[in-house]
């Protein structure tokens, strides 16, 4: 192409060849005249000469010359335009080097050049290329003709079939439609009954055996009861037995109430006429009267806010209420005193262990799919004397609708309640479970309140003891009045309103903006006609906007236009709409139906029914004897009913044929296939043709009755259909049933055709169809009685064919049956054809992973995969139930071929690889479960005195127990034993079986070797398939270890994943950032088991309700002084603390009033505010609160102290401040002083040994008297947060194609728009090369096209479903308001970068960095990030900038007074910098000498310890801190177990993946001020290089040590990692390992016992036992201080007697430091800056670390291999399937696969199950074009896997691309009780963070101290309220 430039620029000459109309460039040449020219050469094929065209840039050709060129045929010259300039032509000029020939008929000069001969090779290459191009075009033409022919043929067939069908149905009328529906649904009903036969059989069996089983086992248990409480304590009984009454036991139904006249009445009779009156009185009265029914009702909403129809469950009895429902208001008489009425009798609710007796409505609902959850879930109980009613949250109704249950807000018309008015917005209601794209009926219900009923709206409150006064209550105004008042009220000056312009607006403003759209256009460029035309369009648009459904229709149109699973080249909107509509109907409705087993079996049932009908109707056919013509049949005697039946069956056949034609991939092949021809013949087309050929005016001919026997042949393929539908049947049964059906099909087909050809034969009495069926049986069995022989030639030929067929048929089928009975199965399913669209999987894929992959595809990417072909060496039989569950619940066709390793040879799978869409090579991630070598059990002894040189202690193959069992019956001679050898042999046997011997000599049970072997086999398969496919097919490789990572990447594999490395990388990040692995895994998983969820929530609430009743019974017992022998005390010291105040839980030691002396001065109000807790129970268990009381080893250090946030990502142990907290700096000083004060407030004699151990225990008693009202708060919070969690669990991560209207949008604006308008989280972008950039806030969408990037970038988005993603991609219009807002943001960005380029000098290059410049210029980073700002960097920022920052955030500062303290501390840090610089040299010299002495003493001490795989083996926790750990300020990480690949975990803990180069430079400067660092000393730098990068001191507690290999050497971690030998199942070993002092605890799924058993289930059981042992240890020491002291005295004997143990471990010298320490503690806080300077200086001089500070709430992570073990943790998880039959087992496997993810233990992110990573394969691009690669996980956790060249880096720099990672930060207290979207926009604009989740702490039971659970809420809704101490998961903004 020409490159036209301006005249000022000279363009270089480009030598181009013109061949076949295409140009190719050559090297540039310069004309001798000096002018730049462009030269083009064209080959004239006729004359074999060159035609050289010259053009000069500065000259133009006249229009006449252009015309002459066009006339002479040289119009192929390409003209290029640049930025819409006028078209320019180049004037041709000669060259002096060439001989010019002038053509008389042309203006072009033909040139003959001598250099042309040298270019013949190049020209020949061009000719070949031209030939190949011609072949491609020819192939395209052939393909176009073929598609056109197939389309026309299909269209002709469809028209012909439909026309013939309509023609035959004209005689029957519209009633035939009813018959068709009856036949279709009747056959489907029969097929459903057949498919569910095992289920119905089980129901019938249980009906007859249920009563006998109950009576049989009723004596073995006592039922659990729930007491219905009443106010009269004297009538209440604590007896477990039901009181003896004549009435039968009441159930969970509506109980009858006793009114004043003691007459019973029914609720249903009296509630309807009094419902509205009762509700109006309920709102007018301040108190409620009467007694409340004991009803299990979920809608425990607030009595002030429940709807009118909910009053059905709340009956208010009054003396003025008569039976007719007349309610008299006696408020003036009654006053404020409630009326006492007689309470009804106590009712007991029994829960049997095998039955749950409930009311009839719930019993019926169990049979149905849905039932009213509102009346069976939660409870209304009166718990106190003041008639305090426990009310549940309104949001339970939201959960009820999500479970597809009827809402209580809509009743039938007989209830006479008007429907609710729907409002578009309600700030108190959370978002729905439905799609957030458009509001549908459920979402409107969630977001609305009634105006007519005057339902009060109140925010969700915390405890009734709330003294904060921050609750939003609205008790005097209805919602409509409040909403009207809010509209008139002036909006608050929020801190983000100046930045955020994307807010919801009224429709009137939108219409006004639309009317004013064209007022700002340039009227000079438009004529009057266009103006009028635009005005008319504007009027039309405004008219359309008034139509309510216009926007919905418009959105639906855009949705279907963009609903193209395959890209389309057409741009016609109507064609795209119809194509999208057909595809949507195909994939959402018809395809689901066509693949359903019910539909497939229904087709076979209709064929069988037609067989019966044919046998009935054929008997009425008559024909003259010996007249064998087909048209001679007389059908007058056939009943008229048969005509309707025949028409019905023909229409059903037409539908089957058209469905098959529509869904076939190769339609031409389908049309001419055997079975489709049979279907076509039996359609009405044959009747239409026969009627046309043989017209009979006398009677009607039913041609379908003549051709009907051919349809019986459809039963031939019934076996394959039944094998896919009745998958619970064995192969032998399927083959037997298939043989029977095939025989019947051949029999009835042969008999029917013979009847049409030969009947009737009166002489031999073969007249009826059954006679010929008898003849068919005789013929097929080859008996040949001779009573009948065919007469016609056609009959004779058919008989011979049937005889030959039966010979071959019987032998082949019997052989196949024998093989199935006696040979293993190697194929399961139907092998896909080469034309099918399938995905090929190779390798020993475990059945569980296959199930996860298919379920992930079905839930996240429905209809994206048609079939899966699996080649596996594992036995096919183990996939039986998984195969059945996949076929039954998805539309995926699956075929499994395997049973041996030879099935995966490249020669066998060659064809399968070539025709596959994508290839997945997977290894066996569950090798321990499916490998026989790991099932061996070896016994070991406790003797560890092993000597490898002793031959008697070596294990030989014959010494292994397993080998002895195998060789038991061999011919080997038995060993003769002597009496003298008994002792020695016994001793040798013990030594042979000890643990170390097994670890050193046995390779059989080494899991690392097994995984390594599997990886090697996987690599071989990859190499073989790579050579077959030649990288043309995308290949995904999954390995366990990362040994062969470089080899795979060098072979250009499409996707690569190492399961073990990814698992340990997630764990390493989660250690620093709580719960991050669970947050990320939620993005790749979408559970859909609503039934299991419902059951789980019901069971959870029943359990909690049981605790409520127990608590109330305990109160009554204490009040009535009744003693019970079975009363369980919660703790040993319960009686001592029974009357203690709840404030004792808030303050660490409430008895010491000295704690409050430090809260003086200006900080008094602030500290009191931070000590406040909305629920007093929280604080005892929360180590992440703002006033954290845990005395960890890092309590006095700024770096380790993350107040209000467990932001352990930034564990930099230098003296800089908290990274993200608003008020963390002032809390830091407060907490440090308070904690150090706690440590010494009772230490009158500090040198006593017991104080260092006992001072942190204090009053840890877990028992306290908790008010009953707190139970309501817990139930309410759990229900609400489970709802929020399940709502966020719907979000998946997808690849997002940006719509055209978003081109030019700033990424930050686009993410804000998508979240606010559509509820989606846009978190990053991804390129075609899989380069991922998270939170690139300065990236402009579509800007890469300006830099000639070939393909546009895609977005990474979190949304609810694939349909919602398509809706977002189909957005066609964005309001002008948003566009203007986006343009304003872009202009600000450009100005900012312009300023940055001017001031690039003078700041050591840091002003070039984007993040630093934004902090200085735009003040986005305020003083809240003091912790990440270095001391030297603080000095650069001037006081003027700090004052500007302070003024900008004054709105938050007014609400949170911690900012005032932050500014003072900021100044203090500025002063400290100058002081530090003065004393720097003196400190360095002092530190050098101290550090050298430390190294010498450490080397002497390490001689005493063993060296195991690079680290030292120590005795206990104290020895490790004294002799091993370099930096003793780091927190402790305890790792239980030592697997083979633990080096992966330590590697990711060591690598500083969370900091950029900027932070590394800061750390070097900060480390220069550290007392242990000396930059001038080489020994110091080398010795501490690895330790500085590790954030923890690590202790590995294990009884086993893996064998050495070249990867697991831990020498790099020897300075901060120690090893303690011992089993983690022993509590003594755990205490030695420092279990009480560990900040983080990881229990790995390795072997923890003496038995070398690698069985996965046993290892998981050990992990569960260790977890419970740890919990029990903490419970014991929290009960009493003495227990803790006794444990310490017993285990740490020497250390306990050492009275200076802390000083000896941490410091080099003496007691002088203690004086400074005491002086520091005695100071109190004042507002004077001088005292603050003293405080900081004293803190920096000496900080005492107590290594025996007990960490009350360590974060524990347990690794579990198999999810089946979770049943022992949470009994509601049902993962055992052995007690079910085959059909139920398949259903249970599918329903429970991965559904454990919503349980409490998983929500708390305490358990990591390896199965969570199984479905990552389903999230890759070959699966769907909307899939995102799972490599995004590495980007989320901060590991940059992108490798860029210099050019690519420059390209990214030009685009302002940046990437970030996930961090956890505290949420400012300003947002407490405010919606989440406010916090989201604040973090987005002010901090440049993208919030994607919330970490929340919830107490699940107030009766236990250790009951706090974490809630990981991913993708929160807009209206979710922020609570205290919530932390946010954000994607931080970093530059590349």
From Swiss-Prot:
GO molecular function: potassium channel activity
Pfam short name (any one): Ion_trans_2
Activity regulation remarks: Partially inhibited by Ba(2+) and quinine. Probably insensitive to tetraethylammonium (TEA).
Xref: InterPro entries: K_chnl_dom, K_chnl_Slo-like, RCK_N, Volt_channel_dom_sf
Name of the protein this chain belongs to: Potassium channel K1
Keywords, ordered alphabetically: Coiled coil, Ion channel, Ion transport, Membrane, Potassium, Potassium channel, Potassium transport, Transmembrane, Transmembrane helix, Transport
Main subcellular location of this protein, as a coarse class: membrane
Coiled coil: 1141-1185
SUPFAM superfamilies the UniProt entry points to: Voltage-gated potassium channels (SSF81324)
